[in-house]
Regions:
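Active-site-adjacent mobile loop/cap segments within catalytic or ligand-binding domains
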Residues: 145-192
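Polyanion-binding loop/helix "lid" in catalytic or ligand-binding cores
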Residues: 141
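N-terminal catalytic or cofactor-binding beta/alpha core of small enzyme domains
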Residues: 1-138, 149-154, 158, 176, ...
Length: 199
C-alpha cells in the first residue's frame, strides 16, 4: 500500500479572521456559494467569527491573535455617519458604556495596523466610494478595535488589525464586495507561514 500522507503539504497560508460584530447584520456571509466553503482571499485563508457580546468577542479574537497562524483581523461594522465605506484608522481608550477608560494603563489612542491606504485603494478599484477616518463611533467596533490593538505585543511583525465600516443602507452584495476588497488588500501584505521545524 502506498502511503500518500507524505505528499500532503501543510497549509502555509496565513489566517485572516473576519468578524462582522453586529448581531443583527447578516449582510456579510463568509460562505462563498452552495459548496458551503468559506471564501478565501488570494494567499490567505479566512477564519470566520460570528457576532457575540462585545466582551466575549474581544476574548475570542485575542485568543486567535495569540495563535501563530493568525496574521490579521478584519472587523466589519456599519458606518452611520456617511454613505461611504470607511476604514477607521484609530480607536480610543474608552469603555463600552459610561465614557470611562477601558484600561487604566493603556494609551489614549491605538492606531490600526492594517494597510489602510491600500485597503481604501482596493475599495475604489472595486467601484465603491471609500475613505479613511480617525473618527470612531460609540459602538462595539471602537471597543473591539482598541481591545485588540492594546493587547498586541510590541513587535515589528504585529498582525494587521483593521475596522471596515460599511454604509448603513448598503446592499448585501455591496458589503460582500467591500469586505472581499479590504481583506484581499490585507492578504497581499501577508507572508506565507514558515515551514514547521522537525525535531
Amino acid at each position: 500500500m502506498v502511503d500518500n500522507t507524505a505528499d500532503i503539504k501543510p497549509d502555509r497560508r496565513p489566517a485572516i479572521v473576519i468578524c462582522a460584530y453586529e448581531p443583527d447584520d447578516t449582510s456579510w456571509d463568509p460562505v462563498e456559494d452552495l459548496s458551503g466553503l468559506l471564501w478565501n482571499p488570494v494567499g490567505a485563508r479566512t477564519v470566520a467569527v460570528t457576532a457575540q457580546e462585545p466582551e466575549q468577542l474581544a476574548a475570542i479574537l485575542n485568543r486567535h491573535l495569540r495563535e501563530r497562524e493568525c496574521r490579521a483581523v478584519l472587523l466589519v461594522g456599519r458606518n452611520r455617519r456617511s454613505e461611504a465605506f470607511r476604514l477607521q484608522m484609530r480607536a480610543e481608550n474608552r469603555a463600552l458604556t459610561g465614557g470611562a477608560r477601558l484600561t487604566r494603563n493603556g494609551p489614549a489612542v491605538a492606531r490600526a495596523t492594517a494597510p489602510i491606504a491600500d485597503m481604501v485603494r482596493a475599495l475604489h478599484d472595486a467601484g465603491l466610494v471609500a475613505d479613511a477616518s480617525s473618527d470612531g463611533e460609540e459602538d462595539a467596533g471602537d471597543y473591539l478595535l482598541y481591545s485588540l490593538l492594546a493587547n498586541l505585543r510590541d513587535d515589528a511583525d504585529a498582525p494587521a488589525i483593521g475596522l471596515l465600516r460599511t454604509p448603513y443602507d448598503s446592499t448585501a452584495a455591496a458589503v460582500r464586495k467591500g469586505v472581499k476588497a479590504a481583506a484581499g488588500a490585507i492578504a497581499r501584505h501577508l507572508s506565507p507561514l514558515p515551514h514547521a521545524r522537525h525535531i
